[in-house]
Swiss-Prot record:
This is Uncharacterized protein L412. GO terms for molecular function: zinc ion binding. It comes from Acanthamoeba polyphaga mimivirus (APMV). Keywords: Metal-binding, Zinc, Zinc-finger. It comes from the Viruses. A zinc finger (C3H1-type) spans 37-65. InterPro entries: Znf_CCCH (IPR000571), Znf_CCCH_sf (IPR036855).
Length: 284
């Protein structure tokens, strides 16, 4: 569905031919469409070195400076350039430990996984962007459009990159662009460190993705094990008290062993076939 605005001064000219005579009629357009994706892609004509027939009225951007960056894309870029990774390192760390606070209560595991995947997408450069043949620009979905924003894949995944560290120069135009139209500016680093493959975000305390996944799985296992400790004595008394006077099997714990039972043992307590009745019990 399109949104419309009434402040349009646009006109359309149509040429007609009647009995060999040509004439032009001008029609005023009172409404124009507001495109939700306006200026988010680079104009194809400009990329191909051609003149755009729409000029300033083109719905596509004619330069990177004119391009509008998608909000989710801008957030990922700001993570890369912010001194504190926009707080993402502390959020991912507290979430994998199961800690919830004001800063991360709205950041689910699914959202954190999504951010890691978007960061991973910026570990390679879009070849068409480097040759100025891609319409994506800042919003490119095939990789990063500028090498100064590229992330080292090995560092992001494992934190074990052995390449020599170098300083990465980020153009101030990019920094200013990512800070524009924001209520809160991010704090850029005095110098960005990485290797020939891109930024090393672990130097700013991001948790490597594989480590994050491993710790999250261990946290889930710990939570699962914590509910497996069942008071066997109380469980036995419950069965006995509910079946006084019957021959129903009643568990009695004669051991001082306080270790947790296995999953198979716990499951066996709740199987119907464990409670057997003799033929005499069913005789009226």
């Amino acid at each position: 569905m399109h949104n419309y605005t009434s402040d349009s001064d646009e006109e359309i000219k149509l040429e007609f031919t009647d009995n060999g005579k040509s004439y032009t009629k001008v029609y005023h357009i009172p409404y124009r469409t507001n495109h939700s994706n306006e200026k988010k892609l680079i104009c194809f004509s400009i990329i191909n070195g051609e003149n755009c027939i729409y000029g300033p009225n083109c719905t596509y951007a004619h330069s990177l400076s004119e391009q509008i960056i998608e909000e989710d894309k801008k957030f990922i870029y700001r993570i890369i350039l912010d001194e504190n990774l926009m707080g993402f390192s502390s959020i991912s760390e507290s979430n994998e430990k199961g800690c919830i606070n004001e800063s991360n209560k709205n950041m689910s595991d699914r959202k954190i996984e999504e951010i890691y995947k978007k960061l991973l997408n910026l570990t390679h450069i879009c070849e068409k962007c480097t040759s100025n043949k891609c319409t994506g620009g800042y919003n490119c979905r095939n990789g990063v459009f500028d090498s100064s924003l590229k992330i080292c894949k090995n560092d992001l995944l494992t934190g074990e990159c052995l390449n020599k560290l170098v300083n990465i120069k980020v153009d101030e135009i990019i920094v200013d662009k990512l800070n524009s139209n924001q209520t809160e500016s991010f704090k850029s680093c005095q110098s960005y460190q990485g290797c020939i493959n891109g930024h090393h975000l672990t130097l700013r305390n991001i948790i490597p993705y594989y480590k994050y996944v491993h710790q999250k799985e261990n946290s889930r296992k710990y939570q699962y094990q914590s509910v497996r400790y069942i008071d066997i004595d109380q469980l036995g008394k419950l069965f006995c008290n509910n079946n006084v006077g019957s021959n129903t099997y009643c568990y009695q714990n004669e051991s001082d062993d306080t270790e947790s039972s296995t999953d198979e043992e716990i499951s066996s307590w709740f199987r119907k076939d464990e409670f057997e009745f003799s033929d005499s019990d069913n005789t009226v």
